[in-house]
From Swiss-Prot:
Annotated Ni(2+) 2 binding sites: K222, H251, H277
Residues annotated for substrate binding in this entry: H224
Cellular component terms per the entry's GO annotation: cytoplasm
Modifications made to the protein after synthesis: Carboxylation allows a single lysine to coordinate two nickel ions.
Signal peptide: none
Cofactor(s) listed: Ni cation
GO molecular function: nickel cation binding; urease activity
Active site: H325 (proton donor)
Entry protein name: Urease subunit alpha
Co-factor binding details: Binds 2 nickel ions per subunit.
Length: 586
């Protein structure tokens, strides 16, 4: 017998369903549920008098690896927001990996069940929650280990970068130089409940030192201007990368000492490269580093301190730059260096290039002119600002499927495509760029269950739960001495997944294939799940989800004005942002 229920009551009980819209935090962004995997009337929910009880929604089936056994964990009635869609579903987790996205329950009493709940199944309530893939930050200065706590509390589950601690080289550049430092950082990684990978230093005109670092366990190489990003170093680094299937990241030559942007592009020789600081102020060829956005072999990323362009951005950046790059405000040349790097015109253009999908990746530049805990937050602030200033975003026609959803989105008044474009910038696209998308970066079957649960009102600001390799690793938790878990003070605290042997069983360390073949993980006694990066050299910008546009770029060297496909890119700084004062005391 059917029982009618109105949408409001249904959403309160089981979360939104097809046709319902959800506001992301306090932004002007609205997403709409595109599909619901449930069978109406057969939804599963845990609690007193609810469905997941023996003989009802819970079966007597044991846990196991195959499709006909129960899952270890089920997230019920979750609203999934990912690059591939915005759907309502149950999520089944087995052995720390995403087993199935579909309908959970008891196959003995319910139809259309593909996620079996049994006595050995834990339940995480996803009703009224948005679930996203754990964020990936590929621009980490490993200056202090406390960054990892901040990252996890913000929803980041993978950190890629370089460094050895608060050394001068690390505070300025993202390199872990030499095999000894690489080995020590790999051993240190075992202590942290997060996925990690380290760049070797890529600045040399001879290949031997680069090969040594790759074989030691670097997952990639980093070229940084402070070490000399010359055309010779670029060419050598990319040549070695092609031999070993690892990615190269580059911070180009701000001062144009070793060559101009055209010389750097020529040194690329059409080989794929991940360009850091493809932006308005963070570094790289002044003033025209944004030119690289037009090339299909360039995977462009920007960092979060300029995101989005506000009335405070320029002033803040000058002070940050002087500290990060050891500049002296009493030396005129140092001041000129700072002024050339902080340009309002190119910062404004950076906003729009993100909205066009021409800048494909968002990252932090942690403690080196960027904030590790604000990658997600500032991505969505940028999306909000662009909706206010540029209006509804029409989707590009997908180059692989040729699917155009613009009519659907515009008629329904949702921001689904803009949401997919922006979430891809810190999830699947950095994973593709660094050869780890087969493990992480999206909510897809077979990938590591690195997931974040958000209350919609706190989306992008403060996650409710962070799941790492299928286990809760960080969560909003109240007073441990209270009679229940919710009394104040409630804040993000480490959970059981962040301790002991659970860390190694749920976290990955990414290295080169060469290091795997040389058995470096075994020699170092690593306890985490170690995996090689792959397919970093046979990709292009076209492989990056929803962020693959390559407009013809022109930057005026005197006025710093930016054009894309003949259109002047300019926008006003804002004085008020969402996801800001409303959520934080300081």
């Amino acid at each position: 017998m059917n029982y009618p229920i109105n949408r409001q009551d249904y959403a309160a009980m089981f979360g939104p369903t097809v046709g319902d819209k959800i506001r992301l935090a306090d932004t002007e962004l609205l997403i709409e549920v595109e599909k619901d995997f449930t069978t109406y009337g057969e939804e599963v929910k845990f609690g007193g008098g609810k469905v997941i009880r023996d003989g009802m929604g819970q079966s007597p089936i044991i846990n196991g690896d195959d499709d006909n056994t129960a899952v270890d964990t089920v997230i019920t009635n979750a609203l999934i927001l990912d690059w591939w869609g915005i759907v309502k579903a149950d999520i089944g987790i087995k052995q720390g990996k995403i087993f199935k996205i579909g309908k959970a329950g008891n196959p003995y009493t319910q139809d259309n069940i593909d996620i079996i709940i049994g006595p050995g199944t834990e339940v995480i309530a996803g009703e009224g929650r948005i679930v996203t893939a754990g964020a990936i930050d590929t621009h980490i200065h490993f200056i202090c280990p406390q960054q990892i706590e901040t990252a996890l509390a913000a929803g980041i589950t993978t950190m890629i970068g370089g460094g050895t601690g608060p050394a001068a080289g690390t505070t300025a550049t993202t390199c872990t130089p030499g095999p000894w430092h690489i080995h020590r950082m790999l051993q240190s990684a075992d202590a942290f409940p997060i996925n990690l990978g380290f760049f070797g230093k890529g600045n040399t005109s001879k290949p031997e030192a680069l090969e040594q670092q790759i074989k030691a366990g670097a997952l990639g190489l980093k070229l940084h201007e402070d070490w000399g990003s010359t055309p010779a170093a670029i060419d050598t680094c990319l040549t070695v990368a092609d031999l070993y299937d690892i990615q190269v990241a580059i911070h180009t030559d701000t001062l144009n000492e070793g060559g101009f942007v055209e010389n750097t592009i020529a040194a690329f020789k059409n080989r794929v490269i991940h360009t850091f600081h493809t932006e308005g102020a963070g570094g790289g060829h002044a003033p025209d580093i944004l030119k690289v956005c037009q090339y299909d072999y360039v995977l462009p990323a920007s960092t979060n301190p300029t995101r989005p362009y506000t009335i405070n951005t320029v002033a803040e950046h000058k002070d940050m730059l002087m500290v990060c790059h050891h500049l002296d405000p009493n030396i005129p040349e140092d001041v000129q260096f700072a002024d050339s790097r902080i340009r309002p015109e190119t910062i404004a253009a950076e906003d729009i290039l993100h909205d066009l999908g021409a800048i494909s990746i968002m990252s932090s530049d942690s403690q080196a002119m960027g904030r590790i805990g604000e990658v997600i937050l500032r991505t969505w602030q940028t999306a909000h600002k662009m909706k206010l200033q540029r209006g509804w975003l029409a989707p590009n026609i997908d180059p692989e499927t040729h699917y155009d959803q613009s009519e659907q989105d515009s008629d329904r008044g949702n921001d689904n495509y803009r949401a997919k474009r922006y979430i891809a910038k810190y999830t699947i696209n950095p994973a593709i760029a660094h050869g780890i998308s087969q493990y992480v970066g999206s909510i897809e079957e077979g990938k590591l269950a690195d997931l974040c649960l958000w209350k919609p009102a706190f989306f992008g600001v403060k996650p409710e739960l962070v799941i790492k390799g299928g286990m809760i690793v960080w969560a909003q938790m109240g007073d441990p001495n209270a009679s229940i878990s919710t009394p104040e003070p409630v804040y993000m605290r480490p959970m059981f997944g962040a301790f002991g042997g659970a860390i190694g069983a749920t976290s990955m360390t990414f290295v080169s294939q060469a290091a795997i073949e040389l058995e470096i993980p075994k020699q170092l006694g690593l306890t985490s799940l170690v995996a090689p990066v792959t397919h970093t050299r046979d990709i292009s910008k076209a492989h990056l989800k929803h962020n693959y546009t390559t407009p013809e770029m022109r930057i005026d060297p005197e006025t710093y004005e930016v054009w894309a496909d003949g259109e002047l890119l300019t926008c006003e700084p804002v004085s008020v942002l969402p996801m800001a004062q409303r959520y934080f005391l300081f």
